[in-house]
């Protein structure tokens, strides 16, 4: 019997509503003739501490037997299994993880804009706030979101919710703020050149860090290219 596992980040319901019907068109029955599960990829490119083996693995099957078979596969190479009750729950787990980062990055990006308006040093504010030992998690502002996950994944969730007549306003606002950050950065550059009586046109501008994060060569969705 074959095991099919979807790892790609996607909207809630994909495994059950899209993949399963295609497989069952063959006349085979899930949980009896084949096993189907969802287990989101959780690799962090460039992370020198967390890797495939020591990053807990979310696993959920269409049936309990599917979950068990998927666990048997992954536990050969991954230390910790985290089974959840349904493929939909597993799909939302990954979306929550990346939406959490997107929303918090949007918050600190807006704080950067606020500090700029108030003529304050945002880095001083963040470092001081980071001394609080509880109830605070440090995020840093930047020119926006990049990579093949964070800029895209929240839209899977907001799209699905729109089909249910609900608008995820908080998530969509975060995406809007992050998308606008490259323009905030270019305006800062323009202002700096203007103070030096130079125009953007004709100026030599060095861009360091074209990839979406340090120590990798992936430029997908990199805000530096905007």
PLM region descriptions:
Residues 1-226:
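Structural/interface elements that position substrates and couple domains in central-metabolism enzymes
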């Amino acid at each position: 019997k074959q095991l099919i596992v979807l790892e790609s980040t996607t909207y809630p319901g994909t495994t059950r509503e899209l993949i399963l019907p295609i497989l069952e068109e063959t006349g085979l029955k899930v949980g009896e003739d084949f096993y189907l599960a969802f287990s989101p990829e959780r690799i962090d490119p460039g992370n020198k501490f967390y890797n495939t083996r020591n990053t807990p693995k979310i696993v959920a099957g269409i049936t309990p037997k599917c979950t068990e078979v998927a666990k048997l596969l992954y536990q050969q190479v991954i230390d910790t299994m985290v089974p959840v009750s349904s493929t939909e729950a597993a799909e939302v787990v990954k979306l929550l993880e990346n939406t959490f980062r997107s929303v918090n990055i949007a918050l600190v990006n807006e704080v950067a804009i606020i500090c700029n308006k108030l003529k304050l040093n945002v880095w001083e504010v963040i470092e001081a706030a980071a001394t609080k030992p509880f109830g605070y998690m440090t995020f840093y502002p930047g020119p926006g979101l990049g990579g093949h996950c964070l800029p895209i994944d929240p839209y899977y969730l907001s799209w699905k919710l729109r089909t249910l007549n609900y608008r995820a306003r908080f998530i969509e606002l975060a995406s809007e703020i992050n998308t606008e950050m490259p323009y905030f950065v270019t305006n800062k550059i323009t202002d700096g050149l203007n103070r030096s009586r130079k125009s953007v046109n004709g100026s030599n501008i060095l861009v360091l860090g074209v990839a979406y994060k340090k120590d990798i060569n992936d430029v997908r969705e990199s805000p530096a290219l905007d």
